[in-house]
């Protein structure tokens, strides 16, 4: 398992989800991706995308005006 980060700050919906999808497609099953966003909708949108696409959300949190979502890549 490897860990990766994606900076999706200052991007508005739907770009954080699209960038997450693009990055996940480059990774292997079991890898973890931490996504940093400033779009509050990403707190719901990225986990919903993960459920639909077979990935696991490890953690979601809001710190100040930032949303952080940690995703474990499933089999793609």
Whereabouts are the PLM-identified features?
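An N-terminal amphipathic alpha-helical segment
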Residues: 1-27
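Intrinsic-disorder/low-complexity, polar/charged segments enriched in Ser/Thr/Lys/Arg/Asp/Glu/Gln
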Residues: 1-3, 30-34, 66-68
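Amphipathic, hydrophobic secondary-structure cores in small proteins
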Residues: 19-55
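Intrinsically disordered, low-complexity segments enriched in polar/charged residues with Gly/Pro
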Residues: 4, 11-12, 45-48, 57-58
